[in-house]
């Protein structure tokens, strides 16, 4: 009884508050309320894409290192290696700290809603002093209880609607909302077409500044260009001979060199050495072979001695001499390894700092990742895989390390996106190589990549088929590279 009485009082109060108006005024009031009241959106929704439940085996592959001398078959101590492996074995579910957790697929992009505004009716002017805020009114009015009536009446879109009138205007309210609120499918199509046809930042002939981070001292932004020029000059002085196999070595051939390097890759994986150690080891071997004839029985001794020097130069905790003796199944004694180490150091005149393809690759990967659409880790790991394959090929010594690194970036980008030109003005500026200058080296690396699965030197390929390297060695590669990619005018 009391509630119905309060409702009637509220209705009469609202009727008194609304100024007298004709039929046209009533329609205007109903129109204003129709524009103000929110109607639930019926079927306008976005459906999230189904989550990708595929799981990956995160167990990493450990390269089996064999014992024995190089001449007898490249063996590694089985007892010691198995003990090291069993002690360092981790659960199969462990994920490398470099790996990112699997992410769900992104949801569908929301549709663009175009709301067409309609002309608001003329505001109703009422003196503010004659109104009191309706704290618990039964009318159909959307107003904050903390807002004073005087403030609300200042809005030209505000007007009271009685309960009796709300039922009569509900149908027109629905129609008005459907007319005013509509989804523009044409705009979606136009925006999608514009984004597809618009050139990406890498396709526009502009040079991106990659040395603009002056806060990180490790990037050396102010000295980066000078450091690069110094490395380019040093690589010519500390590069091995390109024909020592034909002119100097009589008992060693390129195939034996490749077998030695393939074995050293396994040793580096076994002792978890950094990549720079492997690249420096190969550099020391080739520089020593460029001026010293050696027989095949001492080739493995040269390899472990050079890796010992490189590990001392690059590693925080380098393996001991005894460990390198053990890894050869004690084919060589400790004194022999130290004697060969001294011979290498004296011949190289203790100039152990040498630019390798890995030095340039770090710089080039960072340049390639600027505004690039390729996944950062996939590009980095794929370029590293291609660069390590180049260590096995004796004929690639005819190219400087900077050119090999630039060609590895070129080929990695081509494998990830075969339809897109892999070179651009930014890479050409920072590498100082045009695409035409990379043609021969890229084709040689492409052949190495394509014959990788059938190679009898599987260490590098098996290394990069691990989950922590994103299985980049398993990526398919087109059988040929379009010739127009090597034309400078297309960059």
From Swiss-Prot:
Source taxon at top rank: Eukaryota
GO MF, one example: cyclin-dependent protein serine/threonine kinase regulator activity
One family name in Pfam for this protein: Cyclin_C
InterPro entries: Cyclin, Cyclin-like_dom, Cyclin-like_sf, Cyclin_A/B-like, Cyclin_C-dom, Cyclin_N, Cyclins_cyclin-box
Extent of Polar residues compositional bias: 75-91
Region (Disordered): 1-32, 69-106
Presence of the UniProt keyword Transcription regulation in the record: no
Keywords: Cell cycle, Cell division, Cyclin
Disulfide bonds: none
GO biological process: cell division; G1/S transition of mitotic cell cycle
Entry GO terms, CC: cyclin-dependent protein kinase holoenzyme complex; cytoplasm; nucleus
Chain segments annotated as coiled-coil in the UniProt record: none
Residue ranges, compositional bias (Low complexity): 1-21
Family: Belongs to the cyclin family. Cyclin AB subfamily.
Name of the protein this chain belongs to: Cyclin-A1-3
């Amino acid at each position: 009884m009391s509630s119905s009485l309060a409702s009637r009082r509220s209705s009469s109060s609202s009727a008194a508050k609304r100024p007298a108006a004709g039929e046209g005024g009533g329609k205007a009031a109903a129109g204003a309320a129709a524009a103000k009241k929110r109607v639930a959106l019926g079927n306008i929704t976005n459906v999230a894409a189904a989550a990708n439940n595929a799981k990956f085996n995160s167990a990493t592959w450990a390269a089996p290192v064999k014992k024995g001398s190089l001449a007898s078959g490249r063996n590694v101590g089985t007892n010691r290696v198995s003990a090291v492996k069993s002690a360092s074995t981790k659960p199969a579910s462990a994920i490398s700290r470099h790996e990112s957790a699997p992410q769900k697929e992104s949801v569908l992009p929301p549709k663009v809603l175009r709301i067409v505004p309609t002309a608001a009716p003329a505001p109703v002017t009422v003196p503010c002093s004659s109104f009191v805020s309706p704290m618990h009114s039964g009318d159909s009015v959307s107003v904050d209880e903390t807002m004073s009536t005087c403030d609300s009446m200042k809005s030209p879109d505000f007007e009271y609607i009685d309960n009796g009138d709300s039922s009569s205007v509900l149908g027109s309210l629905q129609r008005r909302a459907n007319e005013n609120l509509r989804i523009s499918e044409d705009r979606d199509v136009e925006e999608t077409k514009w984004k597809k046809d618009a050139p990406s930042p890498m396709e526009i002939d502009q040079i991106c500044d990659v040395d603009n981070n002056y806060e990180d001292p490790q990037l050396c932004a102010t000295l980066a260009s000078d450091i690069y020029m110094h490395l380019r000059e040093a690589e010519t002085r500390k590069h091995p001979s390109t024909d020592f196999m034909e002119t100097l070595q009589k008992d060693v051939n390129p195939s034996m060199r490749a077998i030695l390097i393939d074995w050293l890759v396994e040793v580096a994986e076994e002792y978890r050495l950094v990549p720079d150690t492997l690249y420096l080891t190969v550099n020391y071997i080739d520089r020593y072979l460029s001026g010293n004839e050696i027989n095949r029985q001492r080739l493995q001794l040269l390899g472990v001695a050079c890796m010992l020097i490189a590990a001392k130069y690059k590693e925080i905790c380098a393996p001991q001499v005894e460990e390198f003796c053990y890894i050869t199944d004690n084919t060589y004694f400790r004194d022999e390894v130290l004697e060969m180490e001294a011979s290498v150091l004296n011949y190289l005149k203790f100039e152990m700092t040498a630019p390798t393809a890995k030095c340039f690759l770090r710089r080039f990967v960072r340049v390639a990742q600027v505004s690039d659409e390729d996944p950062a880790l996939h590009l980095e790991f794929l370029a590293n895989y291609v660069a390590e394959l180049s260590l096995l090929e004796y004929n690639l010594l005819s190219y400087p390390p900077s050119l090999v690194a630039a060609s590895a970036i070129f080929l990695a980008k081509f494998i990830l996106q075969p339809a897109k030109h892999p070179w651009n003005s930014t890479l050409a500026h920072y590498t100082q190589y045009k695409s035409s200058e990379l043609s021969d080296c890229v084709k040689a690396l492409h052949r190495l990549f394509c014959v990788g699965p059938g190679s009898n030197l599987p260490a590098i390929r098996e290394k990069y088929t691990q989950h922590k390297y994103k299985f980049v060695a398993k990526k398919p590669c087109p059988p040929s590279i379009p010739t127009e990619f090597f034309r400078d005018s297309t960059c």
